[in-house]
Amino acid sequence: MRNIIYFILSLLFSVTSYALETINIEHGRADPTPIAVNKFDADNSAADVLGHDMVKVISNDLKLSGLFRPISAASFIEEKTGIEYKPLFAAWRQINASLLVNGEVKKLESGKFKVSFILWDTLLEKQLAGEMLEVPKNLWRRAAHKIADKIYEKITGDAGYFDTKIVYVSESSSLPKIKRIALMDYDGANNKYLTNGKSLVLTPRFARSADKIFYVSYATKRRVLVYEKDLKTGKESVVGDFPGISFAPRFSPDGRKAVMSIAKNGSTHIYEIDLATKQLHKLTDGFGINTSPSYSPDGKKIVYNSDRNGVPQLYIMNSDGSDVQRISFGGGSYAAPSWSPRGDYIAFTKITKGDGGKTFNIGIMKACPQDDENSERIITSGYLVESPCWSPNGRVIMFAKGWPSSAKAPGKNKIFAIDLTGHNEREIMTPADASDPEWSGVLN
């Protein structure tokens, strides 16, 4: 693995079978597994502070997943810490901890820290996983996310998603409104702004490597630019001047091409751009609005929405524009489809009308239309819920949620996450209003 912030020095412990059943994240809601994340042993005060902070992040990651219930340290009976001893399992079972995490932090002469952990099954009294990481002090939070990812993967069978980033549009509450592209950790930490707010910006998108983003900027009312920004160097460049574009491009899995929608002559169509040559290729035909394209994980298909039949619905086509198939058949208008990284589901926004007016919904449906035309499932609804995007393991959806103004409070927009089962909806804290989230892949 190249360009990683830490390297694995050794695999400390063998993986054994364990008593806990693997958590199935796709089929309904199960009670969270109780887990004790013990105090990390430390060899000096700096390591002790780092270990304390890492335990908090690991516990928070596991709690936010909705699949684990971290037990308060005030309940712990055994006082020993570290990885050099075998736990007193009866003491952990007494407080109903099915899983136990022990760890230690040591400061190295280089100034880096060596972090080790073990995951124990207290029922079978077996160690499940263990690893040693070397990490610079300023990247301790990423190391904590990596450990939480390992625990999540061992217990669920799916890769974790904690060591990831979110790019989004931040909007000030003051007038005039200032919109800026912002970047943060998946849990809302380490928020920073990437643009200065001098021009309107929309729909940031990660490149495949997650070290670059693309976004739309309205330089003037008539000039719309797509920018590429390198997150490592901070350098920006103009990808193209695309009059009529409304969303930033989405990228092919190989990173060589991107798709976007552009309005021309009264119609909006899907175009694919070769990022090396900057050549555009039109993929859709006819009249109407075709927009919000998203590649399948293998790059062979594209999902998008179109009002060619009068009401916006979802369609799938081959990446060359052939073999168009409609996949949505429910009542209402569909928008913003996003293909799961696993390839099994497509998330979407759906707008329905009732006696109380419009309702916005986030839903998922099977990606293969021949499977079941009635496979659609709504997982959350509200006054304004939109812009769904997937965690890199395809098990969590992040989206924007809005509330109207009232006599008691102004309107607001925030970012939320929810499991694909429709459970565990939670807000991702941002310093200001937020919209248009995009989730990176797991960082290297």
From Swiss-Prot:
The keyword Signal applies. It comes from Rickettsia conorii (strain ATCC VR-613 / Malish 7). Part of the Tol-Pal system, which plays a role in outer membrane invagination during cell division and is important for maintaining outer membrane integrity. This is Tol-Pal system protein TolB. GO terms for cellular component: periplasmic space. It comes from the Bacteria. The keyword Cell cycle applies. Keywords: Cell cycle, Cell division, Periplasm, Signal. It is found in: Periplasm. PANTHER family: PROTEIN TOLB, PROTEIN TOLB HOMOLOG. Its main location: periplasm. The Tol-Pal system is composed of five core proteins: the inner membrane proteins TolA, TolQ and TolR, the periplasmic protein TolB and the outer membrane protein Pal. They form a network linking the inner and outer membranes and the peptidoglycan layer. Belongs to the TolB family. Residues 1-19 form the signal peptide. SUPFAM superfamilies: TolB, N-terminal domain, Tricorn protease N-terminal domain. GO terms for biological process: cell division; protein import.
